[in-house]
Structures are given as C-alpha cells and as structure tokens.
Amino acid sequence: MSAQDKLIKPSHLITMDDIIREGNPTLRAVAKEVSLPLCDEDILLGEKMMQFLKHSQDPVMAEKLGLRAGVGLAAPQIDVSKRIIAVLVPNLPDKEGNPPKEAYSWQEVLYNPKIVSHSVQDAALSDGEGCLSVDRVVEGYVVRHARVTVDYYDKEGQQHRIKLKGYNAIVVQHEIDHINGILFYDRINAKNPFETKEELLILD
C-alpha cells in the first residue's frame, strides 16, 4: 500500500505521525505535477490535507490528536511527492477580542501551483518561520517576495490566477518551496540570520 493509499482511507485522519521530518529525501525532491483532470485519489488527498489543517487549528481536536497548529501543508510533507498544497489562514479577533465574522481569510487546496510573477521588494516575518517537518527552532529572517501572482488548479480542474501579498504571500511561498524540495531555513542568511536590507519589508 502506498503512502497515498493509506492516507485517503475513509477511516484515516492525518496526524503528526504521518508528517515526515527533515532528513527524509522526499522533502528534498522536486514533486511531480498531478495529471488533469484530477483523479479521485488526488482530490481525496487534498481534502484530507485540509481536514488536517482544520483539526490542527481546533484546540479540542489538536489536543486529542496531538497536532501542532499549521496554516499550510504540502503533499511531500506526508511523503507523497506530488504538487498539491493546502492553505488555511485564520482571521484573528479584533482589538476588542471579538471573533471574526469569517473564520478564515484564505482556504484552498491548490493543484500544480506556480508562481508566475513577483514583486521586486522582498519581505520576511518578524518572528521567522516554522515548519511541521522541522522539529527545532531556526531563527532568522526567511526572505521571500512581498507580493506574488500564482496560477493553480482547484479540485474541479478549473484554473485560477490569484495575487497575494503580506502573510498569505509568505504562506503560499513556503508551501510551494516544499514541492520544489526547499525548506524555509534555506532562505535564511547563514552568516547573518537577521540581516536587514533597506528594501526588506518586515511583517509583524
């Protein structure tokens, strides 16, 4: 039984046990494009990946299943070398602590995503980045594009083009790196992890 066959079984919930860690060669491979129209197995895998992200952000389910919270997951992280990513970016409460009207600012499974253009300006998160496949803290600015335009297919096989900036742009670049065999710390300046160039936009 392949890793994907196991993951898409109706009774299976993706947990941290399914997430492979740095050192596994799948994380360093360039993943293969999925065939269109999408097969049922690839659609199911995308749904399972999104289910994992929702569980990871739900305090009750996360504790029950022992999950670390995530806003994105790429198929190579569950040992399936395919160009599939899921993103689930939650909206935050307002300054008074009131819950947002919409739970998520972005919720999508992207098949064969590709960055087709990007800004000259770079950006990095002030607190750095983490990864479900990296069980350690790696400090430093992860330098990425401040804005990107991404082409992808949804589960219906429809093609989309979206323009992203800020945190959502960072998230999608992190996940697209995964399907290209790149880990976030590859983009940290090894000699000067917190180097700031004049044009670097630091996002809180």
From Swiss-Prot:
Q: Which domain of life does the UniProt lineage start with?
A: Bacteria
Q: List GO BP terms, alphabetically.
A: co-translational protein modification; translation
Task performed by this protein: Removes the formyl group from the N-terminal Met of newly synthesized proteins. Requires at least a dipeptide for an efficient rate of reaction. N-terminal L-methionine is a prerequisite for activity but the enzyme has broad specificity at other positions.
> What Enzyme Commission number(s) apply to this enzyme?
3.5.1.88
Q: Which HAMAP family match?
A: Pep_deformylase
Q: Tell me the protein's name.
A: Peptide deformylase
Question: Which SUPFAM superfamilies does its entry note?
Answer: Peptide deformylase (SSF56420)
Catalytic activity entry = N-terminal N-formyl-L-methionyl-[peptide] + H2O = N-terminal L-methionyl-[peptide] + formate
What is the scientific name of the source organism? Streptococcus pyogenes serotype M18 (strain MGAS8232)
* Entries under CDD domains matching the protein: Pep_deformylase (cd00487)
Q: How is the cofactor bound?
A: Binds 1 Fe(2+) ion.
Keyword terms: Hydrolase, Iron, Metal-binding, Protein biosynthesis
Q: List the NCBIfam families.
A: pept_deformyl (TIGR00079)
Name the positions where Fe cation binds. 131, 174, 178
Identify which cofactors the protein needs according to its UniProt entry: Fe(2+)
List of catalytic residues: 175
- Enzyme category, top tier: hydrolase
Q: Which family does it belong to?
A: Belongs to the polypeptide deformylase family.
Molecular function as annotated in GO: metal ion binding; peptide deformylase activity
